[in-house]
Amino acid sequence: MITIVLLILAYLLGSIPSGLWIGQVFFQINLREHGSGNTGTTNTFRILGKKAGMATFVIDFFKGTLATLLPIMFHLQGVSPLIFGLLAVIGHTFPIFAGFKGGKAVATSAGVVFGFAPVFCLYLAVVFFGTLYLGSMISLSSVTASIAAVIGVLLFPLFGFILNNYDPLFIAIILALASLIIIRHKDNIARIKNKTENLVPWGLNLTHQDPKK
């Protein structure tokens, strides 16, 4: 019984639409009607500012971490923490508290990885922010980090680097999360190809995007 309750709790944690609620409560703004219409971290930064964007990121990240740690906190045996984390990501993407229309799963997925394999998460953070500096695009950084996660989970155990052993479930979860993130960024990928993707106000913009075109 406790297993079922905690699995439901993991989904409900993921379903907390932090950006949407922050916009409605503190700014009287519905993020779905502004910018990209997304309720995640990036659109929150653009529409509501740095403080709201950072708060959204922190909540979205750590709800993934907390969900992943639920079975450890309650000394639950028999179900991998990754399953709880996956349910949080599903909740974030399809939140019951926001009409099943959620974010792109980047921050919450990162939180899940942090809760299960923090050093591997650090590797992905380096990839993410390195790509962000070079390309000035959150979307490109998210997709690149997703691809790097797949490469890392498949290759690192061969060399005993960061990941010492192959974990079939971790591989499957990484493949699922990476696929979800890339699919959720399909419109961004199209804009990157057309060189019209939105930029952050720093970095090198090596692909010469011009969102005003």
UniProtKB/Swiss-Prot annotation:
EC number(s) on file: 2.3.1.275
UniProt topology in membrane: Multi-pass membrane protein
Segments crossing the lipid bilayer: 2-22, 54-74, 80-100, 110-130, 143-163, 165-185
GO molecular function, one term: acyl-phosphate glycerol-3-phosphate acyltransferase activity
Gene Ontology process terms (BP): phospholipid biosynthetic process
Enzyme class: transferase
Domain of life: Bacteria
Compartments, as annotated in UniProt: Cell membrane
Protein's UniProt keywords contain Membrane: yes
Keywords assigned: Cell membrane, Lipid biosynthesis, Lipid metabolism, Membrane, Phospholipid biosynthesis, Phospholipid metabolism, Transferase, Transmembrane, Transmembrane helix
Function: Catalyzes the transfer of an acyl group from acyl-phosphate (acyl-PO(4)) to glycerol-3-phosphate (G3P) to form lysophosphatidic acid (LPA). This enzyme utilizes acyl-phosphate as fatty acyl donor, but not acyl-CoA or acyl-ACP.
Similarity field: Belongs to the PlsY family.
HAMAP family: PlsY
Assembly behavior: Probably interacts with PlsX.
Database matches in PANTHER family: GLYCEROL-3-PHOSPHATE ACYLTRANSFERASE-RELATED (PTHR30309:SF0), INNER MEMBRANE PROTEIN YGIH (PTHR30309)
Name the record gives this protein: Glycerol-3-phosphate acyltransferase
Gene (UniProt): plsY
